[in-house]
From Swiss-Prot:
Pathway: Cell wall biogenesis. May catalyze the final step in cell wall teichoic acid biosynthesis, the transfer of the anionic cell wall polymers (APs) from their lipid-linked precursor to the cell wall peptidoglycan (PG). It comes from Bacillus cereus (strain AH820). Residues 1-4 are cytoplasmic. Belongs to the LytR/CpsA/Psr (LCP) family. Residues 26-303 are extracellular. GO terms for cellular component: plasma membrane. This is Polyisoprenyl-teichoic acid--peptidoglycan teichoic acid transferase TagU. It is a single-pass type II membrane protein. The chain crosses the membrane at residues 5-25. Keywords: Cell membrane, Cell wall biogenesis/degradation, Membrane, Signal-anchor, Transferase, Transmembrane, Transmembrane helix. It is found in: Cell membrane.
Length: 303
């Protein structure tokens, strides 16, 4: 299940399309309408007619999975950043979790800061540009999830089951060790905690993956999604992507086997306070170059 981080949205939509039986037409129509609403091109791509060619040609692609911590009118920051590369030629997938406190240049701001601040400064467009600059790899697509509203998606599928390896209390919810069931509100608190975890941001990233995987597990059974309208309403409200409907379906069809050969990558570095008293995560140039080389090779990028 750990391999399916990217496909939690695509998987649910795909299941609704192909598993609906006699409801197929109504489901397809509803999904189609939802995908039109969640589609939001990057500014750089609005006049680029070739933006979807990589998926249609089944070429290696990269996707930024961005969890935005938006609360009310507060634009927030990116709470979670994962870069996923898919190579359908050798059916392989690599997932890189970027610590949100990573110190790097914020493209378009003329200064360096925590990488998750790019979202607060310039939304998903600046986040994509900053991640591209940091990793020195092209980001072809993005999927943005509003983590505050993610609880609606969890509730829409009837909650999720996870295995918790650390007892803690967060936002008024207590989480015991072992197998536990989470409602939407509980899932949000479960994925936000990091200060009580000795693993810090890495521990939180692990919990975020568990919850996303739990959503996929529920989505794998159409019988559990008879209220698919609630799922689509939650997705429409809380998800944005520059993937079109056709690209999503092509990806669901042609890139699935990439999950069979998956590698999760953590970025090595050192976290400490800078002279300004702010805590940053610093990635050595050599470690970053090694990561860049690995991702560029996987994407078959030569220049």
């Amino acid at each position: 299940m750990k391999k399916k981080i990217l496909f939690w949205v695509l998987g649910i939509l795909g299941v609704l399309i192909i598993g609906g039986g006699i409801y197929a037409y109504n489901v397809y129509s509803s999904v189609s309408n939802t995908l039109k609403e969640v589609h939001q091109p990057l500014k750089r791509d609005q006049n680029n007619s070739n933006v979807g060619e990589k998926v249609s040609k089944s070429e290696p692609v990269s996707i930024l999975l961005l969890g935005a911590d938006e609360r009310g009118d507060d634009k927030g920051r990116s709470d979670s950043l994962m870069v996923i590369t898919l190579n359908p030629k050798n059916n392989s997938m690599k997932t890189v979790s970027i610590p949100r406190d990573t110190y790097t240049e914020i493209v378009g701001k003329g200064k360096s800061d925590k990488i998750n601040h790019a979202y607060a400064f310039g939304g998903v467009d600046m986040s994509v540009a900053t991640v591209e600059k940091f990793l020195d790899v092209p980001i072809n697509y993005y999927i943005e999830v509003n983590m505050e509203g993610f609880k609606d998606i969890v509730d829409a599928v009837g909650g999720v089951d996870v295995t918790n390896d650390l007892e803690f209390t967060q936002d008024g919810h207590h989480f015991a060790k072992g197998n536990i069931h989470l409602t939407g509100d509980q899932a949000l608190a479960f994925t936000r905690m990091r200060k009580q975890d000795p693993r810090g941001d890495f521990g939180r990233q692990m919990r975020q993956r568990q919850v996303m995987q739990g959503v996929i597990k529920k989505g794998a059974s159409f019988s559990s999604l008879t209220g698919y309208g609630d799922v689509l309403a939650a997705i429409q409200k809380n998800v944005k992507t520059n993937l079109t409907q056709d690209q999503m379906f092509d990806m669901q069809k042609n890139y699935k086997d990439c999950l069979k050969n998956s590698e999760d990558i953590q970025i090595p570095g050192d976290g400490h306070k800078a002279a300004d008293g702010i805590w940053y995560y610093y990635v050595p140039d050599a470690a970053k170059q090694d990561l860049t080389n690995k991702l560029r090779s996987h994407l078959e990028v030569t220049k």
